[in-house]
Amino acid sequence: VTTNYLETMKAGLIGIIFSMAALQLAAQKNCVSHSYEQEQISIDRSLKDRNNAIESFVKNQLAQGSVLRTEGAESVFKIPVVVHILYHYPSEKISDEQVYSQIDALNKAFRRKNADTANTPSWFRPLAADCEIEFQLAISDPSCRSTSGIIRKYTPIKRWEANDKMKFSSEMGSDAWDSKSYLNIWVCNLESVAGYSSVMGGPAEKDGIVIGFSAFGTNTGMAGYDMGKTAVHEVGHWLGLRHLWGDEYCGDDGIADTPKQAGNNVGCPTGIRASCNNGSTGDMYMNYMDFTSDACMNLFTKGQKEKMRALFATGGLRNPLLSSKGLQMPLIMESPLPEQDPKWLEV
């Protein structure tokens, strides 16, 4: 009886802890991509130069007008995705259906096919864009074996920080697949952090995005973050976009058609919310690169589309993804080696 009582108390305490973490995350969308970038640059000073070189490449592509303007199926970039799910508690071991819902949310956002695009204010609608970028779970792994594109690993780590340790098996995480062929997404317990993205020009083994398990996919029960748009925001970073306010007061995100704004917006604003002399339109708080609730985010702009797609031009950082074998028929029609119980957990 005593043992059962203790187990019941333990389960109750775990539930309370998860509820507290959920409330803390729901209070504000906490993307730490900028602070992560600054930390990585402080560790590796050359990273800033590599990042600047990529930004210069993008500017040159845009200046030359060489970003693909064609429309139709051939102009849609398809990105193979591998999702690394790291769980300690059963609630963190998200289902295939939850993963599918996130891929669907990414595709609807980047193709502007969400029903809530009808909520875009009339003065911003002419700027909204179908980015013609799609995402698909990989069907071939780096060894050309068949895969579901989903990896699950039990880990003894209960909480992760934005320090990339979840990206390495040696740290009880999961190693990245070749970043030239796949978008790596790690899903784990980040506590109060919603997610973050790697830095352009950073190490290949760290390339990708990390999302808190409670903000991944749709209908998660996480109030304000249950439509999969945290991942949309972080993939925006992964494709070169910055926060609208340029991470400083009235800063510049480098995109001509996004109005300057004083800082991030939260919750679900309405009407014109003016700052930084943008009174004619106000802040573009419904843009995916702000911090508003999922239900209030519904657009990327044409300028953001052009910048993201410039990375896929010949010689661009993301160009190799277009020739990835991740979406090609696997040569070996068998599942990869079991990954539910990695060797470092065998007893």
Region roles according to the model:
Residues 162-243:
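Active-site-proximal segment of zinc-dependent metalloprotease catalytic domains
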Residues 104-115, 237-244, 313, 317:
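Sec-exported extracytoplasmic/periplasmic mature domains
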Residues 223-298:
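The catalytic-center signature of Zn2+-dependent metalloproteases
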